[in-house]
């Protein structure tokens, strides 16, 4: 049987429990717009669906969460691992736990199997990513994850 080889998303050999800041993007399955919608007046903000509210609840429990935005079909977040003690989990453990908790409460698998990560290397990069997260709703229609199909699927 020929199996499709999945692309390795993590940096090979990197310890994702190391102190540092990580920029994470999690997409919904099939990039469906089920987490909310972007309002246009007077300022672009995300209006969360019931699923988005559940995701928000569990995001707020992530230790080291510095900034985040829930978009209609994806979530961006900055997570800081700041301690060498055993109470901090690795990034893969944090993301897995988050996805499991949301899935259990929603009742179906919300997110794609994997996620995108970027190790933040310096303060300048940190500030640039922070700004990107904050401005994401304003630039929704320019976003690479923008999906007109099923514009407000969560209302169906």
Regions found by a protein language model. Give the residues of each.
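Short catalytic/metal-binding and nucleic-acid-binding patches
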Residues: 1-156
